[in-house]
């Protein structure tokens, strides 16, 4: 066998062996609910390399600005996209992302991940408990458009549309976590330790088929 061909085959086999050893990588892309720690539990469930790319207070618009560095540069096998709780903060117009733009941003994120060769899982935003939430945020902007739950459901519907239009797995945490209110911390937004585990379990079911588990 010619030396150059042999060298090429050795390099190819070495590359394939390294990739197999590395195994699948999952990047969890989101806000403070992601940052709170479900990716660590997800990694334990999947026995896979799971990266926590959550950032407190972030919207889809903010996420797009850090996506290359925090997500794509990691060369993920799967990206779990989980935004919405901050996008719908109508009481802070400097933060809020209108629902139509939220839908476009989710589509842009999904398209960029697919272009990079990663599979995508879309999550809907979880429930919000209005009593503690409105101790921190003004209620009037929500009341003007039909109330907090109506607003939240509009953002969840947008996430569902993105998943459906792009034939992506959907984890409907808005519906799933509503059945287990113990997931929620007293602030009405973030997960308890038990909630972190529940979120990881729900997401794991969508990710497993994508990484051959």
Residue ranges: model-predicted function:
Residues 4-14:
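Sec-dependent N-terminal signal peptides
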Residues 7-8, 34, 59-60, 124:
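Ser/Thr-centric signal marking residues that sit
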Residues 16-20:
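Sec/Tat signal peptide C-region and signal peptidase I cleavage site
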Residues 28-29, 52, 122, 185:
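A structural signal for the hydrophobic beta-strands that form the central parallel beta-sheet
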């Amino acid at each position: 066998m010619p030396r150059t061909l042999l060298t090429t085959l050795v390099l190819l086999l070495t590359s394939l062996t390294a990739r197999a050893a590395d195994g699948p990588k999952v990047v969890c892309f989101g806000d403070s609910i992601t940052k709170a720690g479900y990716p660590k539990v997800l990694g334990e469930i999947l026995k896979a390399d799971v990266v926590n790319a959550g950032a407190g207070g972030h919207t889809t618009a903010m996420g797009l600005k850090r996506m290359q560095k925090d997500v794509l540069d990691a060369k993920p096998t799967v990206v779990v996209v989980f935004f919405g709780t901050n996008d719908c903060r109508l009481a802070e117009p400097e933060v809020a992302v209108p629902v139509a733009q939220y839908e476009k941003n989710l589509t842009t994120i999904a398209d960029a991940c697919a272009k990079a060769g990663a599979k995508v899982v879309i999550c809907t935003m979880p429930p919000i408990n209005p009593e503690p939430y409105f101790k921190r945020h003004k209620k009037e902007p929500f009341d003007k458009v039909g109330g907090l739950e109506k607003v939240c459901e509009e953002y969840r519907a947008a996430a569902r549309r993105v998943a459906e239009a792009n034939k992506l797995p959907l984890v409907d945490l808005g519906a799933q976590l509503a059945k287990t209110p113990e997931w929620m911390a007293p602030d009405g937004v973030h997960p308890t330790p038990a909630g972190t585990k529940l979120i990881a379990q729900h997401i794991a079911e969508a990710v497993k088929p994508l990484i051959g588990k």
